[in-house]
């Protein structure tokens, strides 16, 4: 029987463990403390933030021993907040073997380094294991998946062989996995869309309507594509499941933590108050700060990101930020300093259609 070790008793970690265990694979969930492990093992129901009728599947167990959790695993899957990835992979690294896949399920960028999670993992593990790194990302709202609703995700790695190997471990009846070798694009799509989800929450909180939200999402995707291309991503990846797909799901659902934060900001609540009272992390808050600084250092115009940043960190009025974003000032849709989107998406001269021979 294949075994998957999951680092992180987060909603997403438990959701992924449930998917894999229902497939008949052994899942070992690592809890950071013995008390948490005992609580989860005895109650078989993790926390109040999961559906009331949820219980651990038969093949999913919990341990506080990291050695026990990882021993014999085919994959170590890290479902931790992005700012906790480095300390967790440092703990895991000495226990890895060359046969183990190392998969990140986090959607964020590291504060201070602006690194993607696969880069953080690469920093901390033996170079001999680098080929085993993969990432999971896509339009995956955990609560929908736990209710048995269908979803699709993307497994990305530097090689198709590694991506397919990971996808086979995770694919289940209602959870399909596509593969991709554009690991940069898949990670950036999953991370940067959280910024736009904050904005979508602001639009919904202000009752500005679907036209405004559609405009925000579309302009947001343009910014994601611009920054992604500047960092080496394939723009087509950002138009796929890990980019546009995840963007639509996160911006459209009340289940999204980032969307929730945006809505709450329009009610006059402070960011600190909102974050303090959340049971899970809204990754977009830290990602906004990282992306904002990256855009400044690269001299990229990213007005959506800039305005969301000002709301989060400069106490800007959400209503004023929304007004600014809806004021196009008759600029070209693909215009932006150093975006180079004209080069990527420029219209090619149409070929002359040959005339048909009437005979």
Swiss-Prot record:
A GO biological process of this protein is: carbohydrate metabolic process
Entry binding sites for NADPH: 11-12, 32, 107, 142, 257, 281, 283
Answer yes or no on keyword Cytoplasm. yes
- For binding sn-glycerol 3-phosphate, which residues are annotated in this chain's numbering? 107, 138, 193, 246, 256-258
Q: What does this protein do?
A: Catalyzes the reduction of the glycolytic intermediate dihydroxyacetone phosphate (DHAP) to sn-glycerol 3-phosphate (G3P), the key precursor for phospholipid synthesis.
What's this protein's family per the entry? Belongs to the NAD-dependent glycerol-3-phosphate dehydrogenase family.
Name-wise, this protein is: Glycerol-3-phosphate dehydrogenase [NAD(P)+]
């Amino acid at each position: 029987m294949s075994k998957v070790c999951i680092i992180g008793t987060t909603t997403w970690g438990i959701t992924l463990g449930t998917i894999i265990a229902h497939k008949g694979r052994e899942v070992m969930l690592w809890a950071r403390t013995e008390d948490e492990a005992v609580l989860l093992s005895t109650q078989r129901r993790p926390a109040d933030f999961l559906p009331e009728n949820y219980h651990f599947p038969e093949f999913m167990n919990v341990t506080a021993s990291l050695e026990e959790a990882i021993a014999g695993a085919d994959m170590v899957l890290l479902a931790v907040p992005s700012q906790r990835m480095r300390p967790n992979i440092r703990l895991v690294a000495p226990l890895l073997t060359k046969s183990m896949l190392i998969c990140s399920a986090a959607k964020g960028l590291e504060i201070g380094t602006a690194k993607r999670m696969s880069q953080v993992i690469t920093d901390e593990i033996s170079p001999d294991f680098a080929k085993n790194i993969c990432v999971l990302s896509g339009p995956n709202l955990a609560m929908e998946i736990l209710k048995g609703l269908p979803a699709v995700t993307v497994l990305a790695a530097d090689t198709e062989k590694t991506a397919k190997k990971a996808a086979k471990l995770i694919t289940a009846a209602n959870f399909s996995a596509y593969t991709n070798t554009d690991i940069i694009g898949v990670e950036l799509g999953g991370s940067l869309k959280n910024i736009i989800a904050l904005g979508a929450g602001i639009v919904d909180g202000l009752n500005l309507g679907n036209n405004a939200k559609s405009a925000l999402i579309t302009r947001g995707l343009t910014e994601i594509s611009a920054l992604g291309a500047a960092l080496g991503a394939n723009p087509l990846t950002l138009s796929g499941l890990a980019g546009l797909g995840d963007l639509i799901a996160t911006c459209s659902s009340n289940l999204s933590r980032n969307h929730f934060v945006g809505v709450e900001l329009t009610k006059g609540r402070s960011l600190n108050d909102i974050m303090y009272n959340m049971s899970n992390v809204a990754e977009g808050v830290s990602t906004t700060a990282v992306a904002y600084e990256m855009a400044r250092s690269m001299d990229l115009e990213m007005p959506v990101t800039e305005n969301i940043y000002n709301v989060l960190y400069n106490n800007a009025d959400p209503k004023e930020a929304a007004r600014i974003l809806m004021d196009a000032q008759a600029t070209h849709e693909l215009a932006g300093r150093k975006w180079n989107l004209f080069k990527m998406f420029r219209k090619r001269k149409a070929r002359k259609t040959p005339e048909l021979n009437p005979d």
